[in-house]
Amino acid sequence: DPTTFAQQLNSLKDVPFSAIKLGLLPNVEVADLALAYVKAHAGIPVVLDPVLVCKETHDVEVSALRDELIKFFPYTNIITPNLPEAELLAQKELRTLEDVKEAARHLHSLGAKSVVIKGGNRLDTQKAIDVYYDGEQFQILESPILENNNTGAGCTFASSIASQLLLGKSTFEAVQISKKFVYQAIQHSDQYG
């Protein structure tokens, strides 16, 4: 509900933020309010985890939200889409590492300062591969695939990046530290069910 979200943002007007991490923005109206808030807080690190893949969302809503999320790109330090989200943002199927690199270049050209596309195990059955691009060079981050049932890894990854940027790390350092952190958290997590 945009009205409730606006009230929540207003309740934070006296809070001095040092970093902002954005995740699921359920519709264009809420995203537009969040964008105005980000613009009003220029100068602090902003991490966008562009959540676009939800079971409840229809294609028309995804298309409109995609266009709205792209408006955030110039105001972010980094965007952190997973492979399906990167496909929606770049409007291209990503099957190979070269496809992912091309998508990262494209998303950077839309205003994102840095992009890390979380490829997971779709690019390689032996490793989890992420592709980082800052407009100058690519970095490929690999880790072993962990066979367990977890949720929230992408959100934790983006939040960790925001925390590391707040601590003064470069964007790539923040990504490296956060990938290792999330890997270890999953590796040492308890599995239930």
Segments from the language model and where they lie:
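Conserved N-terminal subdomain of the carbohydrate kinase-like
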Residues: 1-55, 60
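Short beta-strands and strand-loop turn motifs
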Residues: 19-22, 47-54, 80-89, 117-118, ...
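Conserved phosphate/ATP/ADP-binding segment of small-molecule kinases
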Residues: 62-137
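Short, small-residue alpha-helix embedded
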Residues: 87-88, 148-171
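Phosphate-handling active-site elements
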Residues: 138-139, 164-178
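Short pre-catalytic strand/loop immediately N-terminal to key active-site residues, enriched for Gly-Thr
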Residues: 138-151
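Charged C-terminal helix
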Residues: 172-193
